[in-house]
Amino acid sequence: LIGVNHVAGHIYACRLAAGRDIYPCLGLVVSGGHTALFRCDDALTMTLLGGTRDDAAGEAFDKVAAILGLGFPGGPALEREAATGDPKAFKFPRAFSDDGRLEFSFSGLKTAVLYACHGQNVSKATPPPAGKLRADLAASFQAAVVDALALKCKQALRHTGLKRLAVGGGVSANKALRAGLAAACEREGAELIIPPAELCTDNAAMAALAVEKFRRGEFAPADLDAVPNFL
């Protein structure tokens, strides 16, 4: 019996996509359940550098998509809507942008979108925005998430001295995020590795991490159980 760390599996999918060793690297896992940065010395040795204080990025995408009256899953729906919007139409907050903490927060951003849609009295039932307003809100929200993630990746690359960023999780399929991280890595002289979209969400390639444990003779006891919040 071999236990596989779901989060480590997302980074390992980058190794399979690259077809070569990618370690050591900075790992960013950005999904509906996780938003965290890791120092990855090898496939099985990961040190948490920082995570989110509240919502994960993917969770924020889903919640804001609901506020805007878009479909589920929220990530793809919001990305499609943002494609025709102005990312500078609304100045939404980027948490922790003025300090070096490798932490994320998306709850305040979500609330800012809510107030931009409905004003301060959000208890009243009002229809979701439509047309250009909705597209601009989606684009401005997406830009804020991308900026926050890219900034902390740049800070983490400088902090660790690593020259490779591996990114996994469903949100990493977002084209705007890929472009933002590519620009950040170029400025830092670092290599960016992101799997194709089909390997960003949960997939069987992640379970291939079990091969690394098998090679090392690392097996789990028969009473192994799932740990939903394990990082």
Residues covered by each model-derived region:
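Conserved phosphate-binding/catalytic loops in two-lobed NTP-binding clefts
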Residues: 3, 165, 181-207
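Glycine-rich beta-strand-to-loop/alpha-helix junction loops that act as flexible
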Residues: 31, 165-174
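A contiguous, well-structured pocket-lining segment that forms one wall/lid of small-molecule binding clefts
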Residues: 80-165, 175-188, 215-218
